[in-house]
Regions:
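Primarily secretory-pathway and cell-envelope proteins
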Residues: 21-62, 114-195, 267
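Conserved positions within tetratricopeptide repeat
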Residues: 213-216, 248-251, 270-274, 278
Length: 283
């Protein structure tokens, strides 16, 4: 019986070993980037080949031919809400990201996601969602590994940067945040807003220069003057009152906030409120 059990175990080990696969590094490793831009969640999935002393644009990546914008499977990008890329509207969804290089430009093609692998021989025009272009910028250094990144991120958008070898292409993403935020704020303000709602609305109107009077109204509803205000509440009020031109009141808030930050031993609060206080003291 023991001999039989041993033979069964040995057989299982041999069978398992026969299906084992040797793992090795991928020449073009996959990269996945998740980025919040404004109110939009963006996910980018692509492979990253390296230069390895090869000529890239006009060589490995031929001019005027469809490129998968990376290696292996086509690059994919998804948006949780509609955006604009170089002023072309893109609906929420998941897309393939192809490109077509020339000597001086890189056209980016947002394409309906399909089961295609690798590059396409031609585009099906009915599947082209948008085609946008960027002039190549010559870089002073060589980028060894193909890189796509989101840069210059703000409340309202970012850039999509594509770099490889000594070339950079930049595309503007507009997250259309302002219209969405104003609509959201109006809806919230009509439905029993909380302290946090008033504070966020006030700071958004302040940061985006929409309506500083309304920002003051909301920040005062969020944080009524009292001895219980925290240093960051006073920082918000100082900034908003400063922009509104009410400098004496802004200075008062900055000074009080600075003292409370010291009491709380909050280094970041101390540093930021000291800067605001000194700036206001010099006006």
């Amino acid at each position: 019986m023991k001999k039989k059990s041993f033979l069964i175990l040995l057989t299982l080990i041999i069978v398992k070993s026969s299906f084992a696969q040797l793992k090795s590094p991928n020449a073009s490793p996959r990269s996945n980037i998740s980025q919040i831009i404004g109110l939009v969640s963006v996910n980018l999935d692509y492979s990253r080949p390296s230069k390895k002393s090869r000529e890239i644009f006009g060589g490995l990546v031929p001019y005027n031919k469809i490129w998968r914008t990376g290696a292996n499977n086509p690059t994919t990008i998804s948006f949780s809400d509609y955006v604009k890329i170089n002023n072309q509207l893109i609906s929420a969804g998941k897309y393939h990201l192809y490109s077509v290089p020339t000597e001086s430009t890189l056209d980016l093609v947002i394409y309906e996601k399909t089961d295609a692998c690798g590059s396409l021989p031609t585009f099906d025009k009915s599947k082209v969602i948008a085609r946008v272009s960027s002039d190549f910028i010559d870089l002073p250094n060589t980028v060894e590994t193909f890189t796509i990144s989101f840069e210059n991120i703000s409340n309202n958008g970012s850039t999509l940067n594509i770099m490889w070898d000594n070339k950079l292409a930049i595309y503007n993403i507009d997250a259309l945040t302002k219209d969405k935020m104003i609509n959201n704020i109006n809806n919230v303000m009509n439905n029993n807003p909380s302290t946090n709602d008033y504070s966020r609305a006030a700071m958004y109107y302040f940061e985006e220069d929409i309506d500083i009077e309304k920002a003051m109204e909301w920040i005062n509803k969020a944080y009524k003057d009292s001895d219980n205000l925290r240093y960051w509440h006073l920082r918000y009020k100082a900034l908003i009152y400063e922009k509104a031109g009410k400098l004496n009141k802004a200075l008062e808030y900055a000074e009080s906030g600075y003292k409370r930050a010291i009491e709380s031993k909050a280094v970041d609060g101390i540093n930021s409120l000291e800067i605001i206080y000194r700036r206001l003291s010099e006006k």
